């Protein structure tokens, strides 16, 4: 189970439970990147999950990567950022049996030469192929 929309007041109430700890990062309300970083510094990364939204109110779906950048700026390692922003959510959702951890952990090949109905989004740029 995940308890979402946690903050400085509610997170301590969940820490002694077996629940995952969800944090919704929003502009102006709920939780900011800086507040999330402070919680991670104080309580660690175990079972911490960060999410954002693109809903009916003021929102910013890029708050998750912005939180990752704030974590790096605060001295967290890339491995810690990856733990909070990727591995923790994958571990949580994999418990359902509907998500194959190996499948989502395998990088997909990149070939920007591919087109969709003879169209490319490259706009004259050199394609990346990995």
Regions found by a protein language model. Name each.
Residues 7-9, 36-37, 77-78:
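A generic local structural motif
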Residues 1-7, 24-27:
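Catalytic beta/alpha-barrel core
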Residues 22-26, 33-34:
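Catalytic cores of processing enzymes, dominated by hydrolases/peptidases
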Residues 29-31, 87-88:
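Short secondary-structure capping/turn micro-motifs that flank functional sites
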Residues 1-2, 18-22, 47-49:
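Structural preference for beta-strand elements that scaffold enzyme active sites
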Residues 11-17, 30-42, 54-70, 93-99:
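Histidine/acidic-residue-rich catalytic or RNA/ligand-binding cores of hydrolases
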């Amino acid at each position: 189970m995940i308890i979402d929309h946690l903050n400085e007041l509610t997170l301590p109430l969940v820490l002694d439970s077996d629940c995952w700890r969800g944090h919704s990062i929003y502009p102006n309300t709920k939780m900011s990147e800086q507040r999330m970083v402070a919680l991670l510094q104080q309580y660690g990364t175990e079972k911490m999950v960060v999410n954002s939204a693109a809903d009916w109110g003021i929102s910013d779906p890029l708050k998750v990567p912005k939180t990752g950048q704030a974590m790096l700026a605060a001295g967290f390692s890339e491995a810690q950022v990856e733990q909070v922003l990727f591995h923790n959510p994958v571990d949580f959702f994999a418990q359902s049996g509907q998500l194959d951890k190996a499948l989502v952990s395998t990088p997909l090949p990149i070939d920007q030469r591919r087109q969709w109905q003879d169209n490319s989004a490259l706009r004259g740029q050199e394609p990346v192929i990995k």
